[in-house]
Each structure stands twice: as structure tokens, then as C-alpha cells.
């Protein structure tokens, strides 16, 4: 668990979104946080870092959200995140441990 520094104006905006979601029956509010803006340029600049394989894995979910506009469905398999397209009805889904056959057996990150 960590924290992010935000201004009062930004925290007020976050609070309004969370309160609105809860008031309208949403049970969970997923937060997808990334270590930096995951542009191609930033990924290249950090490609030699020891965390690069992990960041490459996160970028898959980042790009899926950017493409679809809905948070992806996330599962964990053998030490890595697995992302699938999300739907508005699955926004409050929890992360689950599930290994699709194309991921099972790979070396964990």
C-alpha cells in the first residue's frame, strides 16, 4: 500500500466519483495505478531497468483500457497479471487467480 500526493481540487474530484459510484450501488471502486505514463517512449527509456518485464506486463492492461475505455478484467497467473477486455457490468469484479492455457507454465516475472 502506498500513497499519491494530490491537490485538494483533485482529491475533491476523486471523492465525488467514489461517492457517486457508491450512492448508485457500485460495490467496488477499482483503482488501476501505473508507475509512470506508459507511452512507447517512456517504455523504451526504461527498457534496461530490472522492473522492465513487470512494466511490460502492466502495459498490456494499460493499453487495453486505452483501447476499450473500460477497465480490463484482471487475473493473476503464475506471478503475472493477465488482462482481458472488461465490460461495464464487470467494473466491480475482483482480481482472481486464473491461468489461461496461453499463460500457464511461463516463468513468473
Annotate each predicted stretch with a short phrase.
Residues 1-105:
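Exported/periplasmic cell-wall-interacting domains
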Residues 108-109:
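N-terminal targeting segments with Sec-dependent signals, encompassing both cleavable signal peptides
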Amino acid at each position: 500500500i502506498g500513497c499519491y500526493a494530490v491537490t485538494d481540487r483533485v482529491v475533491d474530484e476523486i471523492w465525488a466519483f467514489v461517492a457517486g459510484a457508491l450512492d448508485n450501488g457500485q460495490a467496488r471502486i477499482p483503482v488501476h495505478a501505473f508507475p509512470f505514463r506508459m507511452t512507447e517512449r517512456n517504455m523504451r527509456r526504461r527498457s534496461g531497468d530490472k522492473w522492465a518485464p513487470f512494466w511490460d506486463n502492466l502495459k498490456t492492461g494499460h493499453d487495453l483500457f486505452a483501447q476499450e475505455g473500460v477497465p480490463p478484467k484482471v487475473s493473476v497467473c503464475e506471478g503475472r497479471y493477465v488482462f482481458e477486455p472488461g465490460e461495464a457490468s464487470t467494473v466491480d469484479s475482483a482480481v482472481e487467480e486464473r491461468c489461461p492455457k496461453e499463460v500457464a507454465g511461463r516463468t513468473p516475472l
